[in-house]
Amino acid sequence: MGKYMRKGKVSGEVAVMEVGGALLGVRTRSRTLALQRTTSSQKPPEKGEGDPGAGAGAGAEYLELRSRRLEKPPPHTPPAKEKETARRASAAAAAAVRMPAAPQAAEEFEAEVEVSFGDNVLDLDGDAMERSTRETTPCSLIRSSEMISTPGSTTKTNTSISSRRRMETSVCRYVPSSLEMEEFFAAAEQQQHQAFRERYNFCPVNDCPLPGRYEWTRLDC
């Protein structure tokens, strides 16, 4: 231990304080040699032939510390990932096996479509014609089976003209007579005459005045 002396400026007293040698910043030769021996004794031994870590494979790694040596295990692959990889490999192999049979199946499918294409068109046309006839044709325009012929440009024109005439005939078939029209308007006409007589005390049917608040005078032209 060294001593550090401090002298006061005012009173002139001297204070003595003991401080460790490490704080003084002075290193002797004996302390330097002792520190070197301590450092060399703490260095880990180098790997030799007898070291178990020298012959280990790539899967085992070691972490060296001052006091002991720890082994780092290799990363473990989860089983779910291994199953997924195996499933993809099997699916790819199965797809490669099924590839040669695909062109033959496609040719058979095209042949079946070509054979049944005409029948499907005829069935669809028949259903569409039946549906349109059932939904849009009035009862008065339904023709008998004897009048139906093969469709064509001339037949289409004649059909449109005949259907138009038939519609005009059905609309203008009933014309009321004059007597029926008079009976239809008679009730409304009587109501108007009654309202006129009560308001103006004059009869428009007989063309003569009636007793009331108005006084009527005949004009001689």
Curated annotation (Swiss-Prot):
Transmembrane segments: none annotated. Pfam families: CDI. Residues 63-87 have a biased composition (Basic and acidic residues). Keywords: Protein kinase inhibitor. Disulfide bonds: none annotated. Belongs to the CDI family. ICK/KRP subfamily. It comes from Oryza sativa subsp. japonica. GO terms for cellular component: nucleus. GO terms for biological process: regulation of cell cycle. This is Cyclin-dependent kinase inhibitor 5. Residues 31-42 have a biased composition (Polar residues). The lineage of its organism: Eukaryota, Viridiplantae, Streptophyta, Embryophyta, Tracheophyta. Induction: By auxin. Down-regulated by cytokinin. The keyword Methyltransferase does not apply. Residues 27-92 are annotated as: Disordered. GO terms for molecular function: cyclin-dependent protein serine/threonine kinase inhibitor activity.
